[in-house]
Regions:
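Extracytoplasmic ligand-binding site segments that recognize negatively charged/polar headgroups
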Residues: 1-87
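Solvent-exposed loop/turn segments at secondary-structure junctions
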Residues: 2-5, 24, 32-36, 105-108, ...
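Short, hydrophobic alpha-helical packing/hinge segments within bilobed ligand-binding/sensory domains
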Residues: 14, 88-89, 107, 147, ...
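Alpha-to-beta junction loops
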Residues: 22-25, 93-99
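Periplasmic-binding protein-like
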Residues: 62-73, 113-137
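A ligand-binding cleft/hinge motif common to bilobed small-molecule-binding domains
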Residues: 101-116
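Mature extracytoplasmic/periplasmic domains
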Residues: 135-213
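Conserved C-terminal helix/tail region of periplasmic/extracytoplasmic solute-binding proteins
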Residues: 203-248
Length: 248
């Protein structure tokens, strides 16, 4: 491992993103609604500044945050910002980065390529998100029926089991449990050591026997959340600042 694994929730930290040991080998997701929170958590964890409400920053806090980040970017601390999961996988597999923002399918793909890659379980807590499907009140007839059928399909069990192999959770996990092997359920949801090798959605081995999911069980991980991804009141104010960061 290039970045030594620490003790979950004790020594692992968002501040690792700013550690000078990884200078030039750090990347973040190119999305101010996501990557901004990763960097804010890192800056706060490093003790450079504190936010009154990190999920809804003031303009003054946003300016102070970028005052911390721009000099780092100008000195080449960040390798770049990725715009897609395949791009993040390529960066990791090509050794362009050793630590970065990543989504679960990317981590599964890197492990599937035979390169050890794991999430940190930061002592400050996770940045969490939840995706939803919304139906317009103006939808009627066959279109509405098809939309409900699609949403019901997502909750039918099989889709939740499929995305579990990428590391994602679903809101009704018990429905998906029957579509997962006991070994898969124990690893992905219960936080137990993998009884056997487990495969990702491409059929590649992404979990070795005996390994434990970073952060532990579903309950343990959901109990350690620092901030939920939201669109802040000052989201639009962050856009030109984020572009300034990318171009620095």
């Amino acid at each position: 491992r290039v970045v030594p694994q620490g003790i979950p929730y004790e020594t692992e930290s968002w501040a690792w993103l700013l550690d000078p040991r990884w200078h030039g080998k750090v990347a973040v997701v190119n999305d101010p609604a996501i990557g901004l929170f990763d960097l804010a958590l890192a800056v706060q964890a490093a003790g450079w500044m504190q936010f009154e409400d990190i999920g809804n920053m003031t303009r003054q806090e946003i300016d102070q945050l970028f005052a911390c980040l721009l000099p780092l970017k100008q000195r080449g601390h960040f390798r770049g910002a990725w715009a897609s999961v395949p791009e993040s996988v390529e960066m990791m597999c090509n050794n362009e980065v050793v630590i970065q923002s990543m989504f679960s399918p990317g981590v599964a793909a890197v492990n599937g390529a035979g390169i050890p890659c794991s999430y940190a379980a930061p002592r400050e807590g996770y940045r969490a998100w939840h995706g939803v499907m919304c139906l317009s009140s103006a939808t009627t007839g066959n279109t509405r029926d098809a939309a409900y059928e699609y949403m019901n399909w997502w909750l039918s069990g099989w889709p939740g089991a499929f995305i579990a192999r990428q590391g994602y959770y679903i809101s009704n996990p018990q429905r998906s449990r029957e579509h997962l092997s006991p070994a898969e359920w124990d690893y992905w949801y219960a936080g137990k050591p993998a009884r056997t090798e487990l495969t990702n959605t491409f059929g590649e081995v992404s979990v070795s026997a005996g390994s434990v999911r970073s952060g532990g069980s579903y309950d343990q991980r959901l109990s350690n959340i620092s901030v939920w991804n939201t669109v802040m009141n000052n989201y639009e104010y962050t856009l030109p600042r984020w572009r300034e960061f990318l171009l620095a």
